[in-house]
Amino acid sequence: MEVAMVSAESSGCNSHMPYGYAAQARARERERLAHSRAAAAAAVAAATAAVEGTGGSGGGPHHHHQTRGAYSSHDPQGSRGSRRRRRQRTEKKKLHHRQSSFPHCSDLMPSGSEEKILRELSEEEEDEEEEEEEEEEGRFYYSEEDHGDGCSYTDLLPQDDGGGGGYSSVRYSDCCERVVINVSGLRFETQMKTLAQFPETLLGDPEKRTQYFDPLRNEYFFDRNRPSFDAILYYYQSGGRLKRPVNVPFDIFTEEVKFYQLGEEALLKFREDEGFVREEEDRALPENEFKKQIWLLFEYPESSSPARGIAIVSVLVILISIVIFCLETLPEFRDDRDLIMALSAGGHSRLLNDTSAPHLENSGHTIFNDPFFIVETVCIVWFSFEFVVRCFACPSQALFFKNIMNIIDIVSILPYFITLGTDLAQQQGGGNGQQQQAMSFAILRIIRLVRVFRIFKLSRHSKGLQILGHTLRASMRELGLLIFFLFIGVILFSSAVYFAEADEPTTHFQSIPDAFWWAVVTMTTVGYGDMKPITVGGKIVGSLCAIAGVLTIALPVPVIVSNFNYFYHRETENEEQTQLTQNAVSCPYLPSNLLKKFRSSTSSSLGDKSEYLEMEEGVKESLCGKEEKCQGKGDESETDKNNCSNAKAVETDV
């Protein structure tokens, strides 16, 4: 053994020579691969330059795509197999050369050790080459012509070419790029194609959602209600189905729907599913500028100070008209007014025995110089002027006369002119036909009763009455059920109490229709006491009637109250919701060009270290500019100081 060792050392052979030689062989192989790759890259660059030089006269970009496609269309498996076979032949030659060069070292080397090491080396190099080839194929760019007309703009990546937008010829991987959305610390992950279904929404529009992008974490951050976002994301995943979570209040979820800009149609459909009727409010304005100003002046009191003043005058006139309508029914005013109307109608024969009739007749009192008539005339003049002006300036005559408020205006004005025409006709008749005059007098009283509808004119200037009207209109289904239940209960219990009290001679229920009043009063828990059962059977029926009335009324009332709360909160918080939506901004310290860069990024993670360092440098430059600006101002506000301190904190995090 010692002789073998001496002979080995004398021949210059090291016992560890196979491992050292393997390291040298590995280094030479890497050098050879580097030279071969450099030569291949130079060949590709030369071919590309030649193609670009020949394609300048026409169809250059198209020819470039074809050449690139030709490079990518060769068989990668065949090229890898041929390279592997060449390497194996080269390694066999090298192994044979080493065995012939070191004949004395063959006894010292383990059998097959060098061949095993070279085989491992070749396998590692093959793996590295395959990974590099896959990366080369991953960077391949497909043109729109390669994929036909099926390529849409939603399948292309946005790019920043200095012109403010556009799309590059890079396709998404079948639109399966993933995006991370952070809602108040709760992370959601979805695909880009899911959001692209609704490009008009906040999440579907790349331009809109860019302001909420956080490049440090490569995600979109929204400081919004977390439970609501489950339904918002499901809206995109389901293709347009919007369902409110059970644990989210209606008004909060409505705010979230408006913030994410799902659209008015989606909001109306959601409200219909919740049980609210679709509102048909015409907010159109006249095209003529003069008519537009008049329309705003009389229709929208909140539009300007003069419009508010006109609204106040209109409310005062309505109140005066209602007060006059009530005061003229007092006994001391009613007698004189009836006598005046009778004298105006020519009814002298009916007033001969009345002591006040000669006094009124001699004093010259007529209906035209009555104080109530004069005040009412002034009110009617204002109502007529307001109605004519609004009719002149309205955007659409058809919609104007279909509006319920305008119909109320007409109904409140017409009785005055009918009364005036009737009085003039009776004066010209000269008092003939007392029966006809009495009938006209009764008709005038009924017409004067219609003037009570003027109180509904206040709803034009009262938010509370408008909310009540919207509530009743939205609760028509529940009100119909309530009336139907009451109708059934009235019929059932009035019949029962009639037959229960049939044998009692002193009963108050002479017939079933007579018992209707008692059943209604009992079911509504009013109980006037004018009609009551006497027998034991009648009292049992009355008890059941009261219990059934309580249950019948209690069932639909919560829905009506819920509708009222919704309309009340919507009217009082509409402006606050708009301000919250408009004031939602993104991080102010990120430069716009940096956001555009990350918006055009094709990866859902930072990945490349150079991109991360470039992003870090851009953020620092922006923060340094903010800091210098803060330090340069001697009288900065408290908000600026806080912003500067926040800038330093963000810079430290970066």
From Swiss-Prot:
Q: Which residues carry this modification: Phosphoserine?
A: 122, 600
| Reaction equations catalysed | K(+)(in) = K(+)(out)
TM stretches of this protein: 306-327, 372-393, 405-425, 441-461, 477-498, 540-568
- Whether Transmembrane counts among this entry's keywords is yes
Q: Which residues lie within the membrane without crossing it?
A: 513-524, 525-532
What topology does the record note for this protein and the membrane?
Multi-pass membrane protein
The record's SUPFAM superfamilies line, in alphabetical order, gives: POZ domain, Voltage-gated potassium channels
Residues with attached carbohydrate: 353
Q: Where do Low complexity bias regions lie?
A: 36-50
Which superkingdom is the protein from? Eukaryota
- Region annotated S4-S5 linker sits at 463-476
GO cellular component terms, semicolon-separated: axon; axon initial segment; membrane; plasma membrane; voltage-gated potassium channel complex
Q: Where is the composition biased (Basic and acidic residues)?
A: 630-641
Q: Name one GO molecular function term.
A: voltage-gated potassium channel activity
Question: From start to end residue, where is composition biased (Acidic residues)?
Answer: 122-137
Which stretches are Extracellular in the membrane topology? Answer: 328-371, 426-440, 499-512, 533-539
**Compositionally biased tracts (Basic residues):** 81-99
Q: Subunit comment for this entry?
A: Homotetramer and heterotetramer of potassium channel proteins. Interacts with KCNAB1 and KCNAB2. Interacts with DLG1, DLG2 and DLG4 via their PDZ domains. Interacts with SIGMAR1. Detected in a complex with KCNA1. Interacts with KCNA2. Part of a complex containing KCNA1, KCNAB1 and LGI1. Interacts (via cytoplasmic N-terminal domain) with KCNRG.
Supply the domain comment: The N-terminus may be important in determining the rate of inactivation of the channel while the tail may play a role in modulation of channel activity and/or targeting of the channel to specific subcellular compartments.
Annotated family? Belongs to the potassium channel family. A (Shaker) (TC 1.A.1.2) subfamily. Kv1.4/KCNA4 sub-subfamily.
Q: What does this protein do?
A: Voltage-gated potassium channel that mediates transmembrane potassium transport in excitable membranes. Forms tetrameric potassium-selective channels through which potassium ions pass in accordance with their electrochemical gradient. The channel alternates between opened and closed conformations in response to the voltage difference across the membrane.
- This one is known as Potassium voltage-gated channel subfamily A member 4
